[in-house]
Amino acid sequence: MKKWNDVYQMVKNGDLDASLLKTGCENLKAARERATHVMEGFKESFGATEDTMVALCSAPGRTEICGNHTDHQHGRVLAAAVNLDFLACVALNGTSVVHFQSEGWPMTSVDLADLEVKEEEKETTASLIRGVLSKLHKAGYPVAGFDMYVTSTVLPGSGLSSSAACEVLIGTTGNHLFCQDKFDAVEIAKIGQAAENEYFGKPCGLMDQTASSVGDAVAIDFKDPSNPIVRSINADLTGLGLALCIIDCGADHAALTNEYASIPEEMSKVAAHFGKKVLREVKEEDLLADLAQVRKEAGDRAVLRALHFYADDRRAAEEADALERKDKEAFLNLVKESGRSSWELLQNITPAAAITHQDMAVALAVAEKALNGKGACRVHGGGFAGTIQAFVPVEDVCEFKKTMETMLSEGCCHVLSIRPAGGLIL
């Protein structure tokens, strides 16, 4: 923590450029201006002085590259942090209340005197704040009120996991303010996941939080979720001649919690037939050997979703290896296979019984046309709505973006890069 004016001058003078580069910024001048804007917003919102002790912190959104809905079954995933983030200025306020001012939104206030789950707070930012800080408190660290001014380029419903980025932001900040930075990135991810499951009320695996908290590209094996194996991958997409595009399909996934919840529920129902809790504990050959009975007990969709798990779990490991050895053809083929499996087996492209509106299916069909046999595309993240992902030859990216935005909507196609750092105190 340093005085507001000292940090402000450090940003303006370029003394924090090395930290800003870790956020994946492509324009240092713009990054400095954004950081000073956040500091000015903090000062104006909370009446801070130039001597107020502050810190700048950042947490990125994430992109899932392979392993669609495998994490909650203790499977393997390939994911990466991206250069869209939450950037915040924070200061202790001497009270028990957290004041969270997200730019352009009403203030969120959370009194830490009560750290119990609040039903009325579920699916709100307040629940994430209370949940993360409750976990730090239960770990034996005294938590206290702080003021935080936040700007975000990770929009809710964007498929880049804004909730996980918010959890990592609060976790990284709390770890710095109250825990002397004793928690590592994976531990912060676990805290965020617990907050989302228990306080926010949304079942989720650990992929989103781990990718955001650790940074760069990561291959994660959740066989032991209390101790996931995290392997950093040098995902040099530019070296492969590829650009990462995230396309907003035009439908909001914020109200689809039941659709998302049905996937882990049905996969776990298949596992339960074999006396297990998750599919990672069940051999695929055992499922195939008893397929008729499992279909009767769990239903056909559950069986198809289980078959997707086994295939995408293998693909996640193969795709990480392909990226590491810079095998472009193998990588793109695996992306295509993953996309087909999500559509045909996992069935998370269109909400159940949706006929008139199938936004994600249309977006995928348009992307296939725009790619014209080159590159690859797939559903991105939870599915049903939100975004799709495309890996596009760099020489075609401008034309691809133009085609997608002409056929879908202006501004729907975002060209991103992989961010080197995860949750970060600048």
Regions found by a protein language model. Name each.
Residues 1-62, 87, 91-122, 219-378, ...:
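C-terminal nucleotide
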Residues 75-94, 214:
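Structural signature of FAD isoalloxazine-binding scaffolds in flavoprotein oxidoreductases
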Residues 81-83, 160-180, 389:
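DPxDG-like acidic metal-binding loop motif
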Residues 99-101, 145-152, 182-194, 332-337, ...:
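Beta-strand segments within the central parallel beta-sheet cores of soluble alpha/beta enzyme folds
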Residues 133-156:
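Glycine- and acidic-rich phosphate- and metal-coordinating loops
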Residues 138-146, 174-188, 394-407:
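Phosphate-handling active-site elements
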